[in-house]
């Protein structure tokens, strides 16, 4: 009974001996005292309540120090190193400033936001650690959020003013892409026009493909007849059609110019044998060929070469003569039967 009635002094934390709103302590010291776990004494039954009041008062004092720190010089490096050692987990969102243009454009806003961002980052966890209720914890981010939005607006404005050239390439890209890509309808019209002009000039698709090498265009050689055919029938890929169009257009312009000027340029047509005259075989050579045909109507390639060399004729001429002679014999037999 005596023990219960006796007045025992409550165990007080050493922090209570110091004035609550002392202006002698810096913000970093206040944060250290709030974040460091204080030993819970068994004799103090109101310990947690006192600590929450103390933490709330010290947090308000720290915010007050920040507001007063705007008017007098402040060393951010000392606060940064001291606060980095505080074992508090940051749950608040900060806006990192990593662009040098923003710092040079608005130095006052950048330094002010950096200092307050550092302090508020460590203040908000202390409010949750010290045991404040949900309404107080949700009020602080609501008060801080407009400041961050304003700082972000200044940051984006500074970045836009410092780097106006970064917007220009993006606006110019669609124009470049439109120049590179060609309209499919234009390709179709050119393919049809090319086909009609080629036929009017009397040039085959194979002649066009072979004559492209004579244009002396860098990186362009002769093409096959199937490639020209696929271009005219629009069965090539879109990229190949775009790449082949200027080459065929250059050939067509030169071919039409040569045709108008009546200038003989066989390399454009690749037609040295395209317009050769009808071959006429003299009577002595013709009698010799008829004699060979009577012996062997289907001579081998080696035999045709030997006959051509002996009669001083081209091998192709001898081969075609034997082929025509066989067709003539078939017609004669067919007419005799019927």
UniProtKB/Swiss-Prot annotation:
Q: Indicate what this protein is called per its UniProt record.
A: POU domain, class 4, transcription factor 3
Organism, scientific name:
Homo sapiens
Family membership = Belongs to the POU transcription factor family. Class-4 subfamily.
Cellular location of this protein? Nucleus; Cytoplasm
List the SUPFAM superfamilies: Homeodomain-like, lambda repressor-like DNA-binding domains
**Clinical disorder:** Deafness, autosomal dominant, 15: A form of non-syndromic hearing loss with variable phenotype in terms of age at onset, levels of progression, and shape of audiograms.
Q: Which UniProt keywords apply?
A: Activator, Cytoplasm, Deafness, Differentiation, Disease variant, DNA-binding, Homeobox, Non-syndromic deafness, Nucleus, Transcription, Transcription regulation
Q: Which Pfam families match?
A: Homeodomain (PF00046), Pou (PF00157)
Organ and tissue specificity: Brain. Seems to be specific to the retina.
Spell out the molecular function terms from Gene Ontology. Answer: DNA-binding transcription activator activity, RNA polymerase II-specific; DNA-binding transcription factor activity; DNA-binding transcription factor activity, RNA polymerase II-specific; RNA polymerase II cis-regulatory region sequence-specific DNA binding; sequence-specific double-stranded DNA binding
Record note on quaternary structure: Interacts with ISL1.
Q: Which GO terms describe its cellular component?
A: chromatin; cytoplasm; nucleoplasm; nucleus
Query: At which residues is the DNA-binding region annotated?
Result: 274-333
Gene3D superfamilies found in the cross-reference section = Homeodomain-like, lambda repressor-like DNA-binding domains
Q: What does this protein do?
A: Acts as a transcriptional activator. Acts by binding to sequences related to the consensus octamer motif 5'-ATGCAAAT-3' in the regulatory regions of its target genes. Involved in the auditory system development, required for terminal differentiation of hair cells in the inner ear.
Q: What is the effect of changing residue 328 to E?
A: In DFNA15; decreases subcellular localization in the nucleus
Report the superkingdom from the record.
Eukaryota
Q: Where is this motif: POU-IV box?
A: 56-65
Q: What is its main location?
A: nucleus
A biological-process GO annotation: retinal ganglion cell axon guidance
What region holds the POU-specific domain? 179-256
* SMART domains the record matches: HOX, POU
């Amino acid at each position: 009974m005596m023990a219960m009635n006796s007045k025992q002094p409550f165990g007080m934390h050493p922090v209570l001996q110091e004035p609550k709103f002392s202006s002698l302590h810096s913000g970093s010291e206040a944060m250290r005292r709030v974040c460091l776990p204080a030993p819970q004494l068994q004799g103090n039954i109101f310990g947690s309540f006192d600590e929450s009041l103390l933490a709330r008062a010290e947090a308000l004092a720290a915010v007050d120090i920040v507001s007063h720190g705007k008017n007098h010089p402040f060393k951010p490096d000392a606060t940064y190193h001291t606060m980095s050692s505080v074992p508090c987990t940051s749950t608040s969102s900060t806006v990192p400033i990593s662009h040098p243009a923003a710092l040079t454009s608005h130095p006052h806003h950048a330094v002010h936001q950096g200092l307050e961002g550092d302090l508020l980052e460590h203040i908000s966890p202390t409010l949750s650690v010290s045991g404040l209720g949900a309404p107080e914890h949700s009020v602080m981010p609501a008060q801080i959020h407009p400041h961050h939005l304003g700082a972000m607006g200044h940051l984006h404005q500074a970045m836009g003013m410092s780097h106006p050239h970064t917007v220009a390439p993006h606006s110019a890209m669609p124009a470049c892409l439109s120049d590179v890509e060609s309209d499919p309808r234009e390709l179709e019209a050119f393919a049809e026009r090319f086909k009609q002009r080629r036929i009017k000039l009397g040039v085959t698709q194979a002649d066009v493909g072979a004559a492209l090498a004579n244009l002396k265009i860098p990186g362009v050689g002769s093409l096959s007849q199937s490639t020209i055919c696929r271009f005219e029938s629009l069965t090539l890929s879109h990229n190949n059609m775009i790449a082949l169009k200027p080459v065929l257009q250059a050939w067509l312009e030169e071919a039409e110019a040569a045709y108008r000027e009546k200038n003989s340029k066989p390399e454009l047509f690749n037609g040295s044998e395209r317009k050769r005259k009808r071959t006429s075989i003299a009577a002595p050579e013709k009698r010799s060929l008829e004699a060979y045909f009577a012996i062997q109507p289907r001579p081998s390639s080696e035999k045709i070469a030997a006959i051509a060399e002996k009669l001083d004729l081209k091998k192709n001429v001898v081969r075609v003569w034997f082929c025509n002679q066989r067709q003539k014999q078939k017609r004669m037999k067919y007419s005799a039967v019927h």
